[in-house]
Amino acid sequence: MSEEQVNIKKKEKWGIAHIYSSFNNTIIHITDITGAETISRWSGGMVVKADRDEPSPYAAMLAARRAAEEALEKGIVGVHIRVRAPGGSKSKTPGPGAQAAIRALARAGLKIGRVEDVTPIPHDGTRPKGGRRGRRV
C-alpha cells in the first residue's frame, strides 16, 4: 500500500448508532466512537405529527435517514449499532422501529460494523407490575 492509501484509511471516522426502540417511540442517537459526544439525535416523534405514528417503522426510517444525513455531513463514514429495548422489568424485545432504523442507516450510505443488543437484563431486580396473578386479559 502506498502512503496515500494509508492516510485515507486513518481518516475514516466511525461512530456508534444507539437505537432505543420501545412500543411507544424509536430514538436514534449517533455518537462518536467513545460514546461521549453526540453527533445526531432524532426520534420518531420528531418526524411525524400524530402520536400514534411515533413507534411505526416508517417514523423510525425517517428519523434514521435524517440522523444518517447529519452524521455523513460531520464526516462519519460508518457506525456500530447498539439496539436497546426498554428492558428491566419492562419489555425485553425491541419495538417495531428497530429493524427499519437499521435498514435506513445502511441505505443512507453509512457502513455498518457490529450490531449488538444492549437491552438491560435484570439479575433479580424490581418486581414486575401486574400484581401476584399477573395481567388478566
From Swiss-Prot:
One of its GO terms (molecular function) is structural constituent of ribosome. Keywords: Ribonucleoprotein, Ribosomal protein, RNA-binding, rRNA-binding. The keyword DNA repair does not apply. SUPFAM superfamilies: Translational machinery components. Residues 116-137 are annotated as: Disordered. The keyword Iron does not apply. It holds the Pfam family Ribosomal_S11. GO terms for cellular component: ribonucleoprotein complex; ribosome. GO terms for biological process: translation. It comes from the Archaea. Belongs to the universal ribosomal protein uS11 family. Part of the 30S ribosomal subunit. Located on the platform of the 30S subunit. This is Small ribosomal subunit protein uS11.
